[in-house]
Amino acid sequence: VSGASAAAGASGSAGASAAAGASAAAGASGSAGASGSAGSGGFVFSGPGCVVPTKEDDEPTLLSQTGCVDPSDPTKAAATLVPYDVNSPLWSDGAAKERYISLPPGTKIHVKDCMVEPATCKSVDDGGTAEDEGHWDLPVGAVVMKVFLIGGARVETRLLSHVTDTTWRGYSFEWNDAGTDATLLPDQLDKPVGDQTWHFPSRSQCLACHTDGAGRSLGPTTAQLNRDYAYADGSMNQLDKFQALGLFDRTPARIAGYPSPSGDGTLEERARSYLHSNCAICHRPGATVSDMDLRFEVGFADTLLCNQVITAMEDNLDLPRMRLVPGDPTDSSLSYRMHVTSGTRMPKIGSNVVDPDGTKLIDDWITSITSCP
């Protein structure tokens, strides 16, 4: 499941679309907690919620059959789903997005707290990977749903399902031209949408990013969701809302939210936040490419970016020799690979369109760097 338009602004069009979707998900009435028949704020938790098939031949072929949406109007999320937004979203070729979480009745989200559980949680300073402070462990049966919209029209809905303790599955649904329902795709697909080509990922491509090393669900973390959301019953901090709904197994430690790449943080903070959401999925210890660590919490010297020679494998790709040259984005492979759309592009999966705001942010940051630490 990919993120939304990045430096263009989590609080801009993507956030507005998510808030619009929230009014659908939050429209039902109720007052009981998560273990009751309805959740406060209009969320209903007594129903089965999203379907998580245990066998692939049991998979619903239409989005309207998944339980994640209103079957009579699949453009509306089911009342069992809770909408959310993130502080630092992933660039998804300019698409606006709606985001939701579905939990099976009676289950809770476990938020990693390294002070409370040092045996199973490692902080970044101690080399933590998927066990990072503030990571959300979603229970078996949980589903993360994201809806991608181009020009206000639904193009794709992705479901990431936690099937067993060790198994996750990703599903891509293609919306019909009428916008009335979406069909499960058996494989990847490239489709013209407006003036761009939209890529629907295969199931294996979904899991190429949603790895154990990256924490599987990716977006739902304390630092990403520590922000207000415009729910149907009023604006509220998302962590407080999830707590009020009884969705956590204990009150999570409050961690500062990531800076918005288009927000008021320093240039370095905003650039590092962008790299965290757009690059650190793979570039972190234990993930796909572990010789760099681009997580926000890591000190700049430990990212292995500045004045670091590219790998021997990259050397065959006709790239700039250095990952990051202080003051010179044009001679930095980090910038180069964000600007191209050829086979050397980063990220390799999930984006065919250069992010104009994101590339400018990273170029401005590289230009501002005077020396390596």
Where are these regions (language model features)?
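Sequence context surrounding c-type heme c attachment/ligation sites in exported
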Residues: 45-48, 135, 154-373
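Short amphipathic alpha-helical surface micro-motifs
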Residues: 80-85, 127, 276-279
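Conserved small-residue
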Residues: 47-123, 132, 138-185
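Ser/Thr-rich, Pro/Gly/Ala-heavy low-complexity intrinsically disordered linkers and tails
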Residues: 1-50, 126
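Extracellular/secretory pathway and lumenal proteins
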Residues: 53-55, 72, 118, 125, ...
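Long, well-ordered early-domain segments
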Residues: 128-130, 206
